[in-house]
Design a protein with these regions (language model features):
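The serine-hydrolase catalytic nucleophile loop
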Residues: 45-55, 80, 274
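Short amphipathic alpha-helix adjacent to the substrate-entry channel of hydrolases
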Residues: 49-67
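Accessory cap/linker subdomain of secreted extracellular hydrolases
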Residues: 166-250
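Conserved alpha/beta-hydrolase "acid-adjacent" motif
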Residues: 269-275
């Protein structure tokens, strides 16, 4: 496998008086598809450039453009704003990159939504919105704030062709997310005072307006997530119980979604392994690729072969899906 020069084009998308950012990595040959990537981090930490370069190269060598999108983080921003920002980012980049049909009526690149962990949740929720809109259902009902994304006309709008979901979940309303997590309780306890000191406001301590953060380094933000999992209050950091229920996938939603590639490890200490397995069963045309006895983000350690094997399987699934 050759190493592609990982030089990215950068774009800015306006959103509710703030800025969202996208980085586009292009293959050296004509692209055959486009992949939108959302990072993980429990929606409270993480950065959009966290995908190891060996996996980026794998996509590029296979002929896919990779578009890495950021989004605002919780608890400064709630689920409604986060999901609306994701939609604004996707629609904005579809407009910029010209995924809509051109004047001759021929369609441009098919696109896929890819996320790891919380990023997979965002990919699923955005697919629900996009596919609901395409089918004539009220796909926008999942979000309550006004979008500032460029509007795609009905004549050129295309729904995503598929999903790539690595160790994700379809809801925050899981028993495992609402009680102390055994693995996280083994770590040094994080106090609420520490968490409160890490939550940022727009202009410092004298301003109660929540900050709009689109980057949250693990070194400074991971403690928020540890606290949430140690105390079983992760969903509470993201929104009200009504928000959590609303921003979830139902059995009816699974029918609307495009096929996906799902993978997770049986040794996942963070997110239930069954989530990926069950979603692959419920979404028609999907594939589940199990990994055994490794940690939640099993692809983080690139010295282990399981990560590369999962990405190679994902690419094989993409090829099968394109020719189906």
């Amino acid at each position: 496998m050759s190493n592609v020069n990982l030089t990215a084009e950068t774009y800015t998308i306006p959103f509710q008086g703030h800025e969202l950012h996208a980085r586009v990595f292009r293959p050296s040959v004509s692209a055959i598809g486009r992949i939108f990537y959302f990072h993980g981090g429990g929606l409270v930490f993480g950065e959009p450039d966290d995908l190891p370069s060996c996996y980026v190269n794998l996509f590029l060598n296979a002929g896919y453009e990779l578009v890495s999108l950021d989004y605002p983080l919780a608890p400064e921003q709630g689920l409604a704003v986060i999901l609306e920002a994701v939609h604004a980012g996707v629609m904005g980049m579809l407009e910029i990159l010209g995924t809509c049909a051109d004047s001759t009526g021929s369609s441009h690149l098919p696109y896929y939504l890819f996320g790891r962990s919380a990023g997979a949740y965002l990919a699923l929720m955005e697919a629900k919105r996009l596919c609901g809109s395409k089918s004539g259902a009220d796909g926008a009902d999942a979000l309550s704030t006004e979008s500032t994304a460029p509007a795609a006309s009905g004549s050129c709008f295309t729904a995503p062709s598929g999903l790539l979901c690595f160790y994700g979940y379809h809801t925050f309303d899981l028993p495992e997310f609402k009680k102390p997590n055994a693995w996280f309780t083994k770590l040094p306890a994080v106090s609420k005072q520490t968490v409160d000191s890490l939550i940022q406001t727009k202009n410092g301590a004298d301003d109660a307006t929540p900050a709009f953060l689109t980057s949250g380094p693990m070194a400074t933000r991971y403690s928020i997530y540890i606290y949430a999992r140690q105390n079983g209050c992760w969903p509470e950091l993201l929104g009200t119980p009504e928000d959590i229920a609303r921003y979830s996938l139902s059995e009816e939603d699974f029918v609307l979604l495009p096929p996906g590639f799902f993978t997770a490890s049986s040794g996942d200490q963070d997110v239930p392994f069954r989530e990926s397995k069950q979603m692959a069963r419920k979404i028609s045309g999907s594939k589940f690729f199990p990994v055994y006895y490794l940690e939640h983000d099993f692809d983080r350690d690139t010295s282990k072969s399981e990560g590369m094997q999962a990405y190679q399987a994902a690419l094989a699934w993409l090829k099968e899906h394109e020719t189906a």
